[in-house]
Structures are given as structure tokens and as C-alpha cells.
UniProtKB/Swiss-Prot annotation:
It comes from the Eukaryota. The lineage of its organism: Eukaryota, Metazoa, Chordata, Craniata, Vertebrata. It comes from Mus musculus. The modification Sulfotyrosine is found at Y87. It is found in: Secreted. This is Gastrin. Residues 96-101 form a propeptide.
Length: 101
């Protein structure tokens, strides 16, 4: 019985995802189906979206995929430094084991 509920939930979520285009307004479908435009066109569309957003949303700025990727690259740099520090600690453990032999 629980397995059936899980299957039904997955089915409903999949149908909702694939039928998303059917409930979007025609103007949004045309925007999505248009070919790749210039960056200026993309920026203008993002600006238009922000124009109808609330004051707080406009303060956050555009949240497109480009900005998301840039944020991820900023977050990955400190991790690399932490990993380099961890290698020194791991090397210390290895050297201690070699000295005991």
C-alpha cells in the first residue's frame, strides 16, 4: 500500500511537470519558444519581469541562471582552500603511520 502511494505521488508530480506548458499564457510560451536572442533582449525581459515585482524582489536583483552560476563559482573557491588544508592534516596521519613501522 505505501508503495502504491509513492508511485501515485511520482506520477502526479511528473504529470504536473510535463503539463506546465498547457496552463502558461500564450505570451510566455512565445517567449520561451523564440530563438536565442541577444543579451540585451534577455536583460530587457528580466528588467520587465522585475518591473512587476515587489519592492523587495527588485532589491534582490536578477536571479537568472547566469547569476546563479556566478554565485556557485564564488562559493567553490573557499572549499578548495579548505581541502588543501585538509590534505596537510591527512598527510600528517600517513607520515605518523609510516614512522611507527
Amino acid at each position: 500500500m505505501p508503495r502504491l502511494c509513492v508511485y501515485m505521488l511520482v506520477l502526479v508530480l511528473a504529470l504536473a511537470t510535463f503539463s506546465e506548458a498547457s496552463w502558461k499564457p500564450r505570451s510566455q510560451l512565445q517567449d520561451a519558444s523564440s530563438g536565442p536572442g541577444t543579451n540585451e533582449d534577455l536583460e530587457q525581459r528580466q528588467f520587465n519581469k522585475l518591473g512587476s515585482a515587489s519592492h523587495h524582489r527588485r532589491q534582490l536583483g536578477p536571479q537568472g541562471p547566469q547569476h546563479f552560476i556566478a554565485d556557485l563559482s564564488k562559493k567553490q573557491r573557499p572549499r578548495m582552500e579548505e581541502e588543501e588544508e585538509a590534505y596537510g592534516w591527512m598527510d600528517f596521519g600517513r607520515r605518523s603511520a609510516e614512522e611507527d613501522q
